[in-house]
Design a protein with these regions (language model features):
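Conserved active-site and cofactor/substrate-binding residues in soluble primary-metabolism enzymes
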Residues: 52, 56, 125, 136, ...
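Short alpha-helical
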Residues: 34, 48, 92, 136, ...
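Short Gly/Pro-enriched turn/cap motifs at secondary-structure boundaries
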Residues: 5, 16-17, 48-54, 117-122, ...
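Cytochrome P450 core scaffold surrounding the K-helix E-X-X-R motif
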Residues: 37-41
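Cysteine-cluster motifs in flexible loop/terminal segments that predominantly coordinate metals
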Residues: 35, 72-77, 86-139, 143, ...
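Mid-domain Rossmann-like dinucleotide-binding core that forms the NAD(H)/NADP(H) cofactor-binding site
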Residues: 143-209
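Glycine-rich beta-strand-centered segment in the early N-terminal region that forms part
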Residues: 17-32, 45-98, 142-144
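Extracellular beta-rich ligand/substrate-recognition surface
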Residues: 2-10
C-alpha cells in the first residue's frame, strides 16, 4: 500500500493480505485515479493523515466473504469479475442513513481515513488490493465499459450525476458549466446525454479547445 507519512511524504508498506470475513470482498486493484482530494491530502490540507491514498478505482474480485453472492444492484458476482466499490461506508444508523442519504453518512469516512498500519491495511486505492467492508456498497462493471472510464465512477462521475439529478434537468434545458476540469467534463457529458444544450466557460483557454 502507498501510505501518507507526512505532508508530501509517502511510503510503500507491505502487509499480508487480510482474511475475508462474512460480508466482505477482497478486490485486486486494476486501475486507480488521482482525484483532486488526493492532491489536497498530499499537501496536508485535509483531515486524513497517515492513511492509504486513493479512492477512485476499479478492480477484480479475489475472494467473496460468506453470504456475498450479488452486488448491491442484485447482479451475481464471482471471483474474477470487475467491480467498482463506493469508497465510503454506511452505518445504517445515523439520521442521514435513516433518511436514505447514504452519501453523507456521519461515519462514512471512518474507513477511508483509517491509519495504514491498522488492520485490514488495504483501505485505499493506491495499493495492490482493496478490502470492501460488509456495509460498503459495490457494483459489478459491465464488460463494455473500459477500466479508464469506470475508475472514476465512484467519485467524480457519480457526484456530477447526483448534482444534475438534484436540479431535475430536462431535455432542451440550457446548462452552463463553469470550469472545464475533470468535474466540468463529467457534468458536460452527463448533461449532453440527457439532451441539454451545454455551454462551458473557463478562464484557461486551452481547456476549451
Amino acid at each position: 500500500v502507498l501510505s501518507m507519512t507526512g505532508i508530501k511524504k509517502v511510503e510503500v508498506k507491505e502487509f499480508e493480505l487480510p482474511e475475508v470475513e462474512k460480508g466482505q470482498v477482497l478486490m485486486r486493484v486494476i486501475k486507480s485515479n488521482i482525484c483532486g482530494s488526493d492532491v489536497h491530502m498530499w499537501e496536508g490540507k485535509h483531515i486524513f493523515k497517515n492513511h492509504v491514498l486513493g479512492h477512485e478505482m476499479v478492480g477484480r474480485v479475489v475472494k467473496l466473504g460468506e453470504g456475498v453472492v450479488t452486488d448491491y444492484a442484485g447482479r451475481e458476482v464471482k471471483p474474477g469479475d470487475r467491480i467498482c466499490p463506493v469508497y465510503y461506508l454506511t452505518c445504517q444508523k445515523c439520521k442521514a442513513c435513516l433518511d436514505g442519504n447514504f452519501n453523507v453518512c456521519t461515519h462514512g469516512s471512518d474507513y477511508q481515513g483509517q491509519h495504514a498500519d491498522i488492520y485490514p491495511h488495504f483501505t485505499g486505492a493506491f495499493a495492490t488490493h482493496y478490502m470492501i467492508q460488509a456495509n460498503q456498497y459495490f457494483y459489478k462493471v459491465p464488460d463494455n465499459i473500459p477500466d479508464d472510464v469506470v475508475a472514476g465512477a465512484n467519485c467524480g462521475i457519480s457526484q456530477m450525476y447526483y448534482a444534475i439529478d438534484q436540479i431535475k434537468m430536462s431535455a432542451n434545458d440550457i446548462v452552463v458549466v463553469q470550469g472545464a476540469g475533470g468535474l466540468g467534463l463529467f457534468s458536460s457529458a452527463i448533461s449532453h446525454s440527457k439532451g441539454a444544450r451545454v455551454i462551458v466557460i473557463d478562464s484557461v483557454a486551452s481547456r476549451l479547445e
